Design a protein with these regions (language model features):
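Short, polar/charged alpha-helical segment
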Residues: 47, 64-73, 77-79, 83-103, ...
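Mature extracytoplasmic/periplasmic domains
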Residues: 298, 302, 307-365, 396-397
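Sec-dependent N-terminal signal peptides of Gram-positive bacterial secreted proteins and lipoproteins
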Residues: 4-28
Length: 401
């Protein structure tokens, strides 16, 4: 590119010389060539300066990315803790390995399990990056100083600053809408109507029919708790969960667990992310209906982050750049993950809108409150539903395996 600039300068000098020559010849004719106004000349010069600066910025960015790739390749290895679905996690890791020749090891864990592991490892993590899963546990990790800030180049493609931590501790890659999934055949058999809103879930006729994930292991459940606190206020939310618990059949380890129970009829109503319901419908369970709560709902930002003290720092940084690119996010829908994507050069999954989901039909979720108070709210939840801590919870209902 620098050589091209030199040629452009030479061409400009020759052009100027030819123009002066033509002007000299033209002055003997009927009309002399008019000079351009000073303002127009200044505008042209400014535009050329801007173009040159943009070229230099692009060159610098490309050079920086090339250097990062080489440094990551020199490390040669990356370990990923993934909290998205297994199919997408596996495909994303395989694609990264194919693109960069870096060996990738991965393990699928719920967000709660990841947080527990990195908290215990205290700055000496056995993995390098976290991929997928809602950001409430990520924000807990930020507050505990367990994530490494990184200013990602590809973050410029995020459609809003909402989808990243202000200090670069995590970056969003997708957005999932919280709601209900119901087995319409079972509801018909039982002579029950579909729930339309959060408070409907408290009706006595739904006793033992509802599935939800376990707040001690699943970020999805933590989001449900935060959502109710933000919509109802703290005390009313805890009373809500105390009543809701009477209708809960089981609290699953994974956030997607309840969605997998609805189709076969293991539970009749599931609380979780509606894209997980789409996965089940497209897998053959057309007896499932998706419901967006009438009074409003919230959403997850599925994220990626680097663990503080990781062993393969450059490979970890390259993973974040990769996760914020179409190479990574566009393969989600090919692997049973139908969340809305939050980068501007991604291909949105048509399946999400076909089932009536709207990424903007959500409450103004307070991420800062979630960052500061999630751990407290989870403790308050268990105090409300078990009259004690999570250790007192019935293990046959609150699954951890």
């Amino acid at each position: 590119m620098k050589q091209l600039k030199g040629k452009k300068a030479l061409a400009a000098i020759l052009t100027a010389a030819m123009t002066m020559s033509l002007m000299a010849c033209g002055s003997s004719g009927s009309a002399a060539t008019e000079e351009k106004p000073a303002e127009e000349t200044q505008e042209t010069a400014a535009a050329e300066t801007t173009d040159t600066a943009a070229e230099e910025t692009t060159e610098s960015s490309d050079s920086g990315m090339d250097a990062l790739i080489e440094e990551a390749k020199a490390e040669g290895k990356l370990t990923v803790y993934g909290s998205c679905e297994e199919a997408y996690l596996s495909a994303a890791c395989q694609k990264f390995e194919e693109m960069y020749g870096i060996q990738v090891d991965y393990q699928r864990l719920s967000t709660g399990e990841v947080y527990t592991k990195i908290e215990e490892e205290a700055g000496n993590p056995s993995a390098d990056v976290w991929f997928g899963g809602t950001t409430d546990p990520y924000n807990e990790a930020v507050a505990a100083g367990l994530l490494e800030p990184y200013q990602a180049q590809n973050a410029s493609h995020l459609i809003s600053d909402t989808y990243k931590d202000p200090d670069g501790n995590w970056y969003g890659i997708y957005k999932g809408i919280l709601g209900f999934m119901v087995n319409k055949e079972e509801l018909d058999r039982l002579g029950l109507e579909e729930p339309k809103d959060w408070d409907d879930l408290l009706k006595p006729e739904y006793k033992g029919l509802i599935g939800m994930s376990n707040p001690s292991t699943a970020g999805t459940a933590k989001l449900v708790i935060n959502t109710m606190v933000q919509m109802k206020g703290h005390d009313e939310a805890m009373e809500y969960f105390k009543e809701l618990d009477k209708n809960i059949y089981q609290y699953t380890k994974s956030g997607s667990g309840p969605s997998k129970m609805v189709g076969p009829g293991e539970c009749v109503i599931a609380i979780g992310f509606l894209h997980d319901g789409i996965t089940q419908i497209l897998s053959g369970y057309d007896n499932i209906d998706l419901i967006i709560p009438a009074s409003g709902t919230s959403y997850e930002i599925g994220a990626t982050a680097i663990f503080k003290g990781c062993k393969n720092e450059n490979a970890a940084k390259l993973w974040v750049e990769y996760a914020l690119s179409p190479d990574c996010v566009n393969i989600a829908k090919e692997n049973e993950s139908y969340q809305f994507l939050v980068i501007d050069n991604a291909e949105q999954p048509e399946e999400a809108t076909q089932f009536g989901l709207d990424p903007d039909n959500v409450i103004d979720y307070d991420f800062e409150d979630a960052k500061q108070n999630t751990a407290t709210y989870v403790e308050d939840f268990f105090n409300a539903v078990t009259n004690g801590s999570s250790e007192n919870a019935d293990s046959s209902r609150f699954l951890t395996e």
